[in-house]
Each structure stands twice: as structure tokens, then as C-alpha cells.
């Protein structure tokens, strides 16, 4: 006998489904042998009722176990008793009544099926139920339909739609058993206990099945693993026939796949997180029901058909970012966004690097450029910043804040403009086409298309709030961008506007130095340049600090910002007196130098022209802050086109400490006495040149620089070299030659604290503590081989 024949002979037919089963798959605890599948399908609490109904139908229709293998042999001594005619008639009558009831139930179900036909069709499209998991009753109608169970199966299938709104673990109170009322509560898989049977009480003892089938738990677990995570039934379905009848128990293979994968609450698309790039919004998900959108099940909004199990990271990421265009699920949605974000960061870093390079080299490069290029840049720079917007979507705003001219070897100069978009975001674009492309992508959600010329898609506002928007290409036509023609007339130039909500320009983040803005109400001096380099430097520095002092927080480092605020608080009054009491007029620019840029307009009226470009300010403390960007040791002399000294151009910044002379030749950074700020000092020979930090109003009339007189030692009144002398950081008029400083140090004693050579204990800025020389400074001043060159008479 072959193995197949042996296996076939061992199989037994289930009383309900009529399919051959192995002995371990059969359950003998009921009146008829049934398989575990039928018990799980019908439920352990009503399987006896189904067996009885099937028995009556079989007797009525003559469907007996003719070709089936017999069940377990009856015990020895028990004889099979044939039914009498009276019993057969009673059974036939009962079967007829059951058949009539089943027929009536089928009619009711057909009406409900017609009403829910559309809904079921939609479910079939959305829910890809595996065909192999469909119950045998659908594949073989000759099985259960002839037993009258098709009505219950159809009712369960029709009621599956109502379950879609319920979570997998949301179960109603346990249904009342049809056979008895003593069953325990049902488990989440729809069964009353282990193996689908109620858990026995201690008085009842273990059920018979546990004694006969010790491996039933593992068998049930294997069935559950083959069927997926839902090895049992899902209860809680309302009775499709209405009324207060018992709730149905539906097998998992009749439920939509979305309900088996996870709870309905997990299917709701969460709001997407805010985008990392500026104010650009995230992709808008498709509307419910649309291809690729979160289709709603059963007409209930908020329940997505794309939900997945909680452990499925791929599906959850798709639910977060939405479904891709065209109804397709992109395989790497998150990776695509990450790549795009990474490219955007790289592009912004490159643009900031270009801006930093432009600001760093502007002083030298602009002075060496042709006159047409220089004049155009100065004119355009005097109009910044001003707002621009996208022509097709007026809500997309940016601002132009800087210009430059670039050229490749053998090529003509071409205008480069720097645009911040969105306004206040810090994202910098170095071309009009780049920002126009980004605006187009934000507007149209098209990441693949580029624009030919950004000047055709950008508009600028001539005056803020006027509503007079003009095409940027009209202001900057191709002839102007290549410096073939000059900038159009003044009627085309925009007026500068600085938004109070986002005053910090990207130039403040990359510029090497910033001049603190003057207090509100301070007048603006027209810039004057003693040389071409000075004019370009003044333009760069004016551009580097457009923000008012009360709104500069957030973009600078905390320490630097605190020093700036302290510096401005101490210098505000002195700065006013420097410009008002002095009453200087701006001298004309040097011959051959570039013309001065136009005075700032609009909100720029409260800005202060850097003192380096206006040497009439004399020892203005702003020079100390501005001169860091200049090359060390290149201070302007009186021969550079101005009759006044520009010693302040070589003054070094110090906000809260005495400024010391250089301790060693060459460029060196000396730590200040209180360690707050590194001090940059440099002349090539050993020198003592402290930078100025505080301007006392009462000392301004006595200052040689303010009076346009020569530099003289305060003690011996000898003329000083304009870059080599000892400067008191507190009192501008305290200037000393090296011999007098040397004598003062020796008189005070070099081993102790050495104060100002004037004999006074000049206090530090903002405190009563006097400043004193550092040991390195003392050693430099006491060096005997230092020969100081005296200034000759003009």
C-alpha cells in the first residue's frame, strides 16, 4: 500500500464541510466529528446547533455518510439502533421547518446584498484579499449550501463592511451563547478559551478535548500562523437581519485586508511635519478617493486604505508623506526628500560661500573694475535691500540684498545678485534663475522643470507699500547685466526697504565685520571715500549692517551680540556728539576714485556711515569695530587724499578691556586682560598701538584728530608716527611716544601694575576699574632697539 493510500485511509471526513481531515485536525467532543476549521468558523458556542441543523437537513434530503469513512468505532457492547418510522417522520418535519426558516433568511439576505452591492464592489477593488484564504463555502457552493449554511455565510460577508470602522482589538461584550449561558468571556480571536472552547472552572475540571488532544494548543497556533496574525474569528458584527439577535462571528478571511493589518486609528494620515526648508510647504496629499489618495473605506472619512501594521516602517512612512503623484507609491519617498533636502543645503552653503567671498574681496576688486562696472554696482547696491516676488504667485516673496560682478578669463563682466528666499529664512540664491526655479517648484509642485530666465518671472516693488510692482528684467535688462549700458533712470530704481519682522540680512552671517547701527534719530552722513579702496570698503561695510540695533538678536553669536549691545550702549551718546558737535562736512572723493554711493534712503536713514569712509569723524569708536576686515598694517596716511589722519583705520576692536601694544612683531592676537575678547594688533615692527574703545564727549574738542591737527605726544608734544605710538584706550587725547611711555613705565615700576602714562588711572569702558599694561606690552615698550620714525612737516 502506497504512502498516499495509507494517508487517505487515515483521513476522516468532517461532518459539516465533508472534507477529509487528518485525525489531529478532527475534534470528537461534539455529537459529530468536526474539523477544527469548522469549529473556528462557526464558533465553539454554536457548533452544536449547526451540527444539529446539518443532521436534520441530511436526513430530510437523504444525504447520509455513504461514501465517507466512519468515525471512531462505537464502544464494545453498544449496538446501533435503527430509527423507527415515527422518529423519521418527526425528523423530516423538523428538517422541513429548518429549511423554510433558512429560505426566509436567504430572501432577507438577498435584499440586503442588493442594497450593499456598490459598497462591496468598492471593497473588492480596495481590499486585495488573498484568494487562497477564501472560505471553502465560496469556492465550492455544493458543500455548505446544501446544508443550509450559505445564508449565515452570506450574512457574514455582507456584514464585513460594518466591521471596517472597528479596530481589530475593539470587541463588544461577549455574546450570549445559543447553547448555554455559562460560557466564559471570549478572547480577542473570537474564541471562548484555549482551542476555541470556554475555560473551565475549577469545579468542572479540564475539558475532554484537552485529555484527548494534548497538542491542540500547538495545532491551533500553527493554524493561526498559516492564516496570519488572526488565527481566530473577529466578533462584534451586528446582525444583518436587524433586531436584537446575536452578533455574528466572522472569519478573518472575509474581512478586508486593512482591518487585519492594523487598527483603523493607525490608518488616519497624520499631519505632515513642518518642512525644514524655509517656509515651503509639504506636498499636498491627494483627496480622499482619488487615485493615489487615502481612499476611505465604506464611505467613512479618515480611514485610509493604505494603513499597515504598526511594525511596518515602510507603510508608516508612506502614510506620513502622502502618496506620490499618479497614484503610485514611490519606493523611496523619504530618501527622495532627504536627497532633495541635502542638495538644498549644499546649494545654500555654496551660495553663502560665494557671498562671503564677494564681501571679503569687494574692497579690492570693486576699485580695480572698469568705471561702468563700478558705477553700476554702486548704484544698485544703494537700492538694497528691496523685495521681489514670483510673477505667478504673489505670496512667494524674497529680497535682493547684494550685488557683485564676476568674470571668467577671457569673458566680460556679468552681474551677480544675491537673493534671500523666503524672506527672513537665511536661504541665499546667487542667481535670479535659481530663486525663480525654487519659487516655481513651491508654486507648481514640479521638481523637474527649470526656468530659462529668472528675470522674466520676478517682480520688484519700487517703493514698499505702493503696490508698484515691476518686472525685474526691466530694471536689469541683458545690456545692464553685462555692463554694456548703465542702470536705467532713477524712476526705475527701487527704494530700500528693511522688513522689521526679519531685519537680519544674510550678509550679517558671513561678513567679517559689522558696524553697529546708530541709535534711532541719528542723522546719516553722506559717505566720502579718501581713495577707491576706501569707497568700496565703505560700501561693503554699509551693506554689512543694515539691521537696526534693537532687532539684531538671533543671527549673531550670543557673546558677540552681548559685546555689540554693550558697545553701542556706551557709545551711543558719544557717537551723536561726534557727528553733531564736530559739524564736519564730507570732503570730496579722491581723484580717480569711484564716486561715492548715493545716501541711503527710507529705513536706512537711521544708519551711520562707517567712520573709515568719513574720516572727519576723527576718533570715532566705530572705526575700531569696522577695521577688522581690513588688511592689517594698511592704514591710510594723510597722503591718501585727505588732510586728516586716519589712525582710527588701524585701531583694533576692544569692547571691554584695555587695548595693548603689540608684544611681538607681525600679526598677533593678544588676549585681553579680562579674557572677554581677543584683540587683534599688528604693526610689523614692535610697537604699542592700542585701539580706541571709548570716546568721552568732553575730550572730543581736545583731540588732535578731531581738530585735524598732527599727532603729538601728550607729554612731550613731539609729533608721532601715525601708526606707532601708545594710545590710551579710555581717553582719545592720551597719545604717547615710546620714549615717554618708557619713562612712565620705569617710574611706575615695571613689576607692578602700570597705568596710563599720563599719570591718571583711566577707567575701563563701563566700569570704574582702571586699565593697566600687560606684561607683554611693557616688554615691547621697554625694548631698547625700537627706533620710532618721526613724522616730517608737510
Curated annotation (Swiss-Prot):
| UniProt pathway annotation | Protein modification; protein ubiquitination
Question: Coiled coil: which residue ranges?
Answer: 95-130, 334-369
Q: Which InterPro entries match?
A: I2BP1/2_C3HC4-RING_sf, Interferon_reg_fac2-bd1_2_Znf
Q: Which SUPFAM superfamilies match?
A: RING/U-box (SSF57850)
Subunit-level organization: Interacts with CTNNB1.
Covalent crosslink: Glycyl lysine isopeptide (Lys-Gly) (interchain with G-Cter in SUMO2):
79
Chain segments carrying region Disordered: 172-345, 513-554, 583-669
Q: Where is the composition biased (Low complexity)?
A: 216-225, 302-322, 520-538, 646-665
Composition-biased stretches, type Gly residues, lie in 230-246
Q: Which keywords annotate this record?
A: Coiled coil, Isopeptide bond, Metal-binding, Nucleus, Phosphoprotein, Transferase, Ubl conjugation, Zinc, Zinc-finger
Which reactions is this enzyme annotated as catalysing? Answer: S-ubiquitinyl-[E2 ubiquitin-conjugating enzyme]-L-cysteine + [acceptor protein]-L-lysine = [E2 ubiquitin-conjugating enzyme]-L-cysteine + N(6)-ubiquitinyl-[acceptor protein]-L-lysine
What gene does this protein come from? IRF2BPL
What are the Phosphoserine sites (modified residues) in this protein?
Answer: 69, 213, 517, 545, 637, 655-657, 660
What's the family? Belongs to the IRF2BP family.
GO CC annotations, alphabetized: nucleus
Protein name per the record: Probable E3 ubiquitin-protein ligase IRF2BPL
